[in-house]
Regions:
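Glycine-rich active-site/cofactor-binding loop and its immediate structural neighborhood
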Residues: 102-104
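C-terminal nucleotide
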Residues: 3-93, 106-141
Length: 141
């Protein structure tokens, strides 16, 4: 089960790690940190592929948001309304971002951004469309 996974991950940290001193909340934080690390590793592998699996990226975003919402209590009713609306409109993944209390989230909606933006605005959000690019590069003539 999940407890066995965490135990193996903890053992991989080294022989001197002992979680017995942690209280329930601290253990939750520790486990969430490990789970988030694993999701990040999976996302990195996916993002480095020649052909991106948008559904997989969306799934990983949703998983990360679930950890933040369900285990760390980092979300708000407004964020949840925007995420629900975005998902219903066709987003493949959504998550809160920033500090969590400011009402900021993003939706991953390749090929469907306008409909998802409209859905976010329909529940009181302010939507901005952004596009990812390769980033800064050196151009030589």
């Amino acid at each position: 089960g999940l407890g066995d996974v965490y135990k193996r991950q903890l053992q991989s940290c080294g022989p001197n790690v002992d979680l017995s001193m942690l209280d329930k909340y601290e253990k939750t934080l520790f486990n969430c940190t490990l789970e988030n690390r694993n999701l990040l590793g999976e996302a990195k592998l996916e993002l480095n592929k020649k052909y991106l699996d948008h559904d997989r990226i969306g799934f990983l975003l949703n998983q990360h948001h679930s950890i933040l919402r369900d285990h760390l209590n980092i979300s708000t009713p407004k964020i949840e309304a925007m995420i629900d609306s975005a998902n219903e409109a066709g987003a493949v993944g959504c998550k809160i971002n920033g500090s969590g209390g400011g009402g900021c989230m993003f939706a991953y909606a390749p090929g469907n951004a306008s409909s998802v933006a409209d859905a976010i605005e329909s529940v009181g959000g302010k939507a901005f469309l952004i596009n990812a690019d390769v980033g800064t590069k050196i151009v030589t003539s």
